[in-house]
């Protein structure tokens, strides 16, 4: 099964479980969790079921295309369901079966790995899912997002697209993966991987990046003053990516690192609170029943 077919199979499966299928969000981010389709939608009592592929940029993980498993940019297939179904783990195993992986014939383990994203004020109970010794998925029940307690609980399933495809195709090197017939992962992404690694470690203008972080932070704050959550959040994502670029260049000290993360977290918390209040003023419109429980 090539990678394109694998993604389509997951999309079809989760669509059958009631998830809407979205396109990736067009601002740089380090993980699918950071998309507003997860971060914002996990806030408050309104139900939400969605799936999407999210390119995830992690500058410090770039290896110029020389490492078979570490990348500047990888892909995640993200599934979020709120409230979390009681049978969410069974649904996940069903998705593996659709990919030709019979849980009865393989060693599938849920290894406890509680999750935290300090820069966004997020935390939850979590497990890594290991398939025959390879981690392929992160499974999380959100307890807190943007400093707000989650009620009802959102379940998040994050498939590592390249890792899962490597297992299915029995490839040791991600660049040898077949994306679709006649086209390899290398054909599509190798040049970008090399050049982005060069940029992240060698040629980025750190003075400019420092200025950009401050500019993005001010703009996020300014938009929040007008109650514009989504524009503000875009700039928080830009702050996060800019910080990651600075971190990759090694120009941020240990003390400064904590300070930058704290600045991003403060913005994220303000946005979460503002978003909750804005939805509350609208009467939480996605709640179909009057008896829906409210976030306290």
Swiss-Prot record:
Reactions the enzyme catalyzes: tRNA(Gly) + glycine + ATP = glycyl-tRNA(Gly) + AMP + diphosphate
Subcellular location: Cytoplasm
Keyword tRNA processing: no
GO MF entry, a single one: glycine-tRNA ligase activity
Alphabetized Pfam families for the sequence: tRNA-synt_2e (PF02091)
Main enzyme class: ligase
PROSITE patterns (UniProt xref): AA_TRNA_LIGASE_II_GLYAB
Domain of life from the UniProt record: Bacteria
Keyword Metal-binding: no
GO biological process, one term: glycyl-tRNA aminoacylation
Record key words, sorted: Aminoacyl-tRNA synthetase, ATP-binding, Cytoplasm, Ligase, Nucleotide-binding, Protein biosynthesis
Cross-referenced InterPro entries: aa-tRNA-synth_II/BPL/LPL (IPR045864), Gly-tRNA-synth_heterodimer (IPR006194), Gly-tRNA_ligase_asu (IPR002310)
Any one Gene Ontology cellular component term annotated for this protein: cytoplasm
EC number, UniProt record: 6.1.1.14
Assembly, per entry: Tetramer of two alpha and two beta subunits.
PANTHER family: GLYCINE--TRNA LIGASE, CHLOROPLASTIC_MITOCHONDRIAL 2 (PTHR30075:SF2), GLYCYL-TRNA SYNTHETASE (PTHR30075)
Family: Belongs to the class-II aminoacyl-tRNA synthetase family.
Matches recorded under HAMAP family: Gly_tRNA_synth_alpha
Record-linked NCBIfam families: glyQ, PRK09348.1
The protein, known as: Glycine--tRNA ligase alpha subunit
Organism: Listeria monocytogenes serovar 1/2a (strain ATCC BAA-679 / EGD-e)
Gene label: glyQ
